[in-house]
């Protein structure tokens, strides 16, 4: 039984983390077959429905469908896999996981923590433990938390510049501009404005940012309100936001954001 093969699906929107987790699992649990890897919640759910894995490693924050919603939908399936949530530290989430004996991994991933997690999963699989009751209770607790807890917005964003990956503090952003399938993030470093790329839609990013700090002023532009120098209107009635010696257009439909009541 020790060498029995089990299957798993990995779901996280960070390619580097998926690669790292896959590599660690190959070392710590060679008999575990990774049957699919997903970059968002929708793809994860499709992969789980197709492969019916024994284990799912599920990131909480993913585009298109978050990990909590994926887990909620898993409860409707005939076979509910063992779920391991992956999360950046969140005291409410961690407390909920521990209360309901649901395993979780904190970012950045720890090899020793993952080894302990794998051992626990193998014990549960050998005992054929049904995870649905604990998972259902956890989903119920998360529903209560989302009604009572203040939303947690992103503090950092991972973005690329050339071949490098950078951590960008959202407070340092000047503005964001949608460019085809990517977003261009702009921030000042020294006396120079630098551009970083993030593969996401503007809608997905806005859902992660504090709406009191980041305003969409145009269908393709979001600005950090705290970085605005001034707002002007030209002779034609067009409104402009001035940030770091730049002029950014404000669409007519969004000019009300800057009206003085």
From Swiss-Prot:
Keywords: DNA-binding, Phosphoprotein, Transcription, Transcription regulation, Two-component regulatory system. Residues 7-122 form the Response regulatory domain. The modification 4-aspartylphosphate is found at residue 54. It comes from the Bacteria. This is Uncharacterized response regulatory protein VC_A0850. One of its GO terms (molecular function) is phosphorelay response regulator activity. InterPro entries: CheY-like_superfamily (IPR011006), LytTR_DNA-bd_dom (IPR007492), Sig_transdc_resp-reg_receiver (IPR001789), WalR-like (IPR039420). One of its GO terms (cellular component) is cytosol. The keyword Phosphoprotein applies. It comes from Vibrio cholerae serotype O1 (strain ATCC 39315 / El Tor Inaba N16961). The keyword DNA-binding applies. One of its GO terms (biological process) is regulation of DNA-templated transcription. PANTHER family: REGULATOR OF RPOS (PTHR48111), RESPONSE REGULATOR RECEIVER (PTHR48111:SF69). Residues 157-261 form the HTH LytTR-type domain. Transmembrane segments: none annotated.
